């Protein structure tokens, strides 16, 4: 069996897990880990029986693909030599720290004939996969993604760190261009926004409201979708889905409950029948399969030419473009006295 030769560039808190998973794959050879901190690089290399390299250039000729998991501001520097050499790259999200750089990386991939995949791991969350199966033609989507301040990814704000997950998810669900964006946010800990709210209006008519924050005592990752077929709520942490849809009688005659109420002497008693008689409720527990493993499996298959990556550079850049519009919309908002958001962002 020919093993696919992969390296991991950056073995911090996330990169070490990429290395662990790839090292355990029988059909993959973990060629090495690239890490500028020698102690850390040698530690992870020893742990997974591979080699340590101090720079990306040292492994370009040895690999078919790489996973780039360095801080966002270093993405372009770390990935350029691989893309130019035609090597496949899976870039952790977001593609880059700004849209112009993200576009340049995608153009570099196209010019070099290289595969560029973006690590939007929530696309591989079994709860989202199940949600996507259940939902057709969404009309309204609401996403909530909040967490405590972890002191990770402090080189970017909450829009590029957290909200971009949900931007990409709703784009996958709606499959329509974004027509308009309204947004606001706040800088609390700084230097970037720690809280953001955005409303996306799609050309299809669908609307999505997104909330992201990293100043909350407890983590939450939920997505709720309303469509003509009913309502689905997914908890992306517990992977539990709850859905409601009208019973056949209601579905066949929208508005029929008005007639039922009119014909009932005590209409307030009907409330006990809503979720037993008129709306059918279903609870589903999605698989506990590891999303990061599934994402890396997708990347390896794409490197071999067996499939198109689920989230290509094109989709990753599209999510970045919407994220930039969210940030632009926040320029007139600030809850930090004397420091308009845009001034704080430019200073950072």
Question: Positions of the model-derived regions?
Answer:
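Beta-loop-alpha module in the N-terminal Rossmann-like domain of NAD(P)-dependent dehydrogenases
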Residues: 18, 48-107
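A contiguous active-site-proximal alpha/beta segment in oxidoreductase catalytic domains
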Residues: 96-153, 338
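Hydrophobic residues in well-ordered beta-strands that form the structural core
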Residues: 54, 91, 116-118, 142, ...
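NAD(P)-dinucleotide binding in Rossmann-like oxidoreductases
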Residues: 188, 208-294
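Rossmann-like dinucleotide-binding domain that binds NAD(P)(H)
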Residues: 150-226, 237-238, 314
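N-terminal Rossmann-like dinucleotide-binding module
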Residues: 1-48, 170, 346
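C-terminal helix-rich "cap/oligomerization" subdomain common to oxidoreductases
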Residues: 67-68, 284-286, 291-348
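A short helix->loop->beta-strand "cap" motif at the edges of active sites that frequently abuts
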Residues: 50, 85-87, 112-115, 206
